[in-house]
């Protein structure tokens, strides 16, 4: 059962809504400290996602839930026409299996964030997502709605759902109606943009 605020946002069919019943945190300093101390790191090639939670038995693997649950992007190839070929995973991952906080985030403010989220919502993956300067995501739909918390953002960073365009303010919780709604995000600035993104399950 969805928490009341999320159910309200879904019913209203709004693409973006601020969530006001979760505590706000200044995560940028803690996140940078974890990076600087090599506790966590970005993926060597994509530099796109770090997972806060994982599945049982993968407690130290903050890349386990990175990317698509269905498609194996890490083993994609490019054919002679320049078309990217991506295979399905042998065993697809499932959002509901991500129930364990990665060990690297224990005893940090990110554990407080995770506990606050799990006290209100049934979660799938919770990830820190980096959108690099002058980059745009593919136009796609998710099979869950998401709650976003911008850790670092600036002018020129926007999310688009259907035809609605929104800049998501830093250190503010946002519900995004991405379940079966086409959407993308783009970073027109000259700096990285980091969001904490939680999949909300019903």
How would you describe each model-predicted region?
Residues 167-182:
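Conserved metal-binding segment of the jelly-roll/cupin
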Residues 185-188:
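Asparagine-centered strand-capping/turn motif at beta-strand->loop junctions
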Residues 2-113:
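Non-heme Fe(II)/2-oxoglutarate
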Residues 127-142:
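Conserved short histidine dyad/triad with adjacent acidic residue
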Residues 134, 144, 154-156, 180, ...:
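A generic structural motif
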Residues 150-169:
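A short beta-strand-loop-beta hairpin characteristic of the jelly-roll/cupin
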Residues 147-150, 190-202:
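A short hydrophobic beta-strand segment most commonly corresponding to one strand
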């Amino acid at each position: 059962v969805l928490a009341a605020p999320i159910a309200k946002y879904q019913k209203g069919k709004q693409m973006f809504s601020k969530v006001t019943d979760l505590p706000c945190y200044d995560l940028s300093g803690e996140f940078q400290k974890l990076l600087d101390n090599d506790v966590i790191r970005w993926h060597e090639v994509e530099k796109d996602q770090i997972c806060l939670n994982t599945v049982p038995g993968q407690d130290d693997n903050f890349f386990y839930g990175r990317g698509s649950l269905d498609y194996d992007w890490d083993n994609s190839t490019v054919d002679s026409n320049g078309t990217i070929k991506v295979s399905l995973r042998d065993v697809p991952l499932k959002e509901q299996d991500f129930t364990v906080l990665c060990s690297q985030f224990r005893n940090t403010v990110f554990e407080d964030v995770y506990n606050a989220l799990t006290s209100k919502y049934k979660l799938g993956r919770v990830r820190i997502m980096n959108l690099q300067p002058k980059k745009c995501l593919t136009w796609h739909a998710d099979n869950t709605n998401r709650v976003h918390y911008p850790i670092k953002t600036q002018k020129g960073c926007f999310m688009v759902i259907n035809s609605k365009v929104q800049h998501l303010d830093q250190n503010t919780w946002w519900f995004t109606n991405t379940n079966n709604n086409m959407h993308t995000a783009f970073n027109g600035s000259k700096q990285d943009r980091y969001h904490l993104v939680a999949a909300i399950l019903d």
